[in-house]
């Protein structure tokens, strides 16, 4: 049996990462593989949208540095409260891309203190294996076994003209192999392999839409069925959930159901 056709529960039983285990179990219990990307610039709108979308998602993806009125007390503490209320995990889309010592400091310190609240973050492979080791050290120094952290590598992007493909993507996969427990998977457009070597990588895919094919700014959208059939585990949706004229409650249900049905089809449960 390939990873592609195993259920989330089955994958949770054998996965090397506590973060991935928790996420798979959460997805199965909530019956959702939807990640909501909340890119807004005020704390009020950020928290209001998350409260509306929380029941439908397994993961909330943040770009915390675009919030103009950010503070740990008024932004992060309520975010953590909502994650407990609605039972979702948090993914800070930081895209680290520097030497190990620098990314460690960026991860644990500064204004945002990402390691203290984000279950998952991500990194480019351009600087080599050191980015993984630096972030892992930061996680170890600032968290406990009760709050494990995980890393996604950026193997492929959904934007027009992206340089993240081909040899770059393959080298990024090799970097991911350096740490089976901390690196939980990839931001990618398809399955990235690894099963024959004992890896079970989570694939999270942005650029998923049920209606639009692009946004005029380089984003390309693929359908839910299309991405899940080629290996996606979690669909990442942003403006499709709350853009102009869209009701987050209606769209949250719509994307949750579309993603879950695609998963059931892929695993032979539907």
UniProtKB/Swiss-Prot annotation:
The keyword Lyase is annotated on this UniProt entry: yes
Annotated family: Belongs to the OMP decarboxylase family.
Sorted UniProt keywords: Decarboxylase, Lyase, Pyrimidine biosynthesis
UniProt pathway annotation: Pyrimidine metabolism; UMP biosynthesis via de novo pathway; UMP from orotate: step 2/2
GO molecular function annotations of the record: orotidine-5'-phosphate decarboxylase activity
Active site: 95
Name of the protein described by the UniProt record: Orotidine 5'-phosphate decarboxylase
PROSITE patterns on file: OMPDECASE
Source taxon at top rank: Eukaryota
Entry's EC annotation: 4.1.1.23
InterPro entries in the record: Aldolase_TIM, OMPdecase, OMPdecase_AS, OMPdeCOase_dom, RibuloseP-bd_barrel
GO CC, any one term: fungal biofilm matrix
Catalytic reaction equation(s): orotidine 5'-phosphate + H(+) = UMP + CO2
Sites where the protein binds substrate: 39, 61-63, 93-102, 221, 239
Pfam families, per database record: OMPdecase
Biological process (GO), any one: uridine biosynthetic process
Coiled-coil region(s): none
Family annotation (SUPFAM superfamilies): Ribulose-phoshate binding barrel
Gene name as annotated: URA3
NCBIfam families listed in its UniProt record: pyrF
Protein's UniProt keywords contain Aminoacyl-tRNA synthetase: no
């Amino acid at each position: 049996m390939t990873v592609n056709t195993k259920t989330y529960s089955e994958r949770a039983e054998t996965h090397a990462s506590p973060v991935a285990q928790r996420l798979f179990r959460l997805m199965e219990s909530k019956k959702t593989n939807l990640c909501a990307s909340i890119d807004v610039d005020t704390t009020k709108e950020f928290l209001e949208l998350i409260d509306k979308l929380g029941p439908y998602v397994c993961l909330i993806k943040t770009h915390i540095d675009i919030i103009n009125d950010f503070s740990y007390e008024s932004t992060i503490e309520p975010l953590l409260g909502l994650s407990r209320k609605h039972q979702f995990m948090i993914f800070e889309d930081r895209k680290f891309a520097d030497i190990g010592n620098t990314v460690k400091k960026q991860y644990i310190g500064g204004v945002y203190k990402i390691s203290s609240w984000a279950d998952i973050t991500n990194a480019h492979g351009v600087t080599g294996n050191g980015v993984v080791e630096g972030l892992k050290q930061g996680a170890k120094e600032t968290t406990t076994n009760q709050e494990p952290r995980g890393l996604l590598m950026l193997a492929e992007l959904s934007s027009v003209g992206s340089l993240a493909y081909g040899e770059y993507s393959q080298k990024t996969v090799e970097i991911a192999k350096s740490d089976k427990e901390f690196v939980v998977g990839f931001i990618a457009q398809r399955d990235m392999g690894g099963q024959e070597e004992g890896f079970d990588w989570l694939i999270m895919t942005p650029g998923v839409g049920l209606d639009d094919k692009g946004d005029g700014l380089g984003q390309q959208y693929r359908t839910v069925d299309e991405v899940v059939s080629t290996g996606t585990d979690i669909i990442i949706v942003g403006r499709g959930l709350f853009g102009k004229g869209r009701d987050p409650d209606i769209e949250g249900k719509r994307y949750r159901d579309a993603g879950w049905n695609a998963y059931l089809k892929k695993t032979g449960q539907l």
